[in-house]
């Protein structure tokens, strides 16, 4: 629709170049305030608005169809090398994959082998954890694809950069 197209960053409306996950400064519609994050799952990009009409664009991996987050949230928690545990829904969907987590409260310690990667930004709505995250990954080939259980994945070096830029309380919009 025209309204939806008007909300998109200028570069996302008519992408003619090949997909690139590399951070790049791009033009952005002025309706988004500096400091906000905008995520466009269909184009696999996250935009950090740096100034009116300008944003740093990062390539991301997003949730599989039916598992993706949409709407607005705030970053209420930030963690370096976070621990990880699959959600109960993930365990129910794929019990064979996550069988070591059935019937316990175990969590995988943070570190290079952890699926959340080097950093995680925890998305909340009205003070409640959504269980969706913007995080690093151990699967760099998943960037630019819709393969996750719903979270927004970034290359570790990119999520470290973003982590340093965004404070607690940052508004996140996923269209």
Can you say where each PLM-predicted feature lies in the sequence?
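Short glycine/proline-enriched turns and hinge-like loops at secondary-structure junctions
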Residues: 51, 145-147, 166
């Amino acid at each position: 629709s025209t309204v939806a197209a008007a909300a998109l960053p200028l570069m996302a409306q008519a992408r003619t170049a090949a997909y690139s996950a590399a951070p790049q400064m791009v033009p952005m519609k002025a309706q988004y305030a500096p400091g906000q994050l905008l995520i466009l799952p269909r184009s696999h990009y996250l935009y950090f608005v740096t100034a009116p009409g300008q944003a740093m664009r990062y390539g991301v991996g997003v949730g599989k169809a039916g598992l993706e987050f949409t709407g607005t949230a705030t970053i209420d928690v930030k963690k370096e090398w976070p621990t990880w545990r699959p959600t109960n829904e993930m365990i129910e969907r794929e019990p064979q994959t996550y069988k070591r987590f059935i019937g316990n409260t175990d969590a995988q310690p943070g570190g290079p082998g952890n699926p959340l990667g080097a950093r995680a930004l925890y998305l909340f709505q009205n003070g409640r954890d959504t269980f969706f995250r913007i995080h690093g990954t151990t699967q760099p080939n998943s960037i630019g694809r819709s393969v996750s259980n719903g979270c927004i994945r970034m290359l570790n070096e990119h999520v470290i950069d973003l982590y340093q830029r965004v404070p607690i309380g940052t508004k996140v919009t996923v269209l």
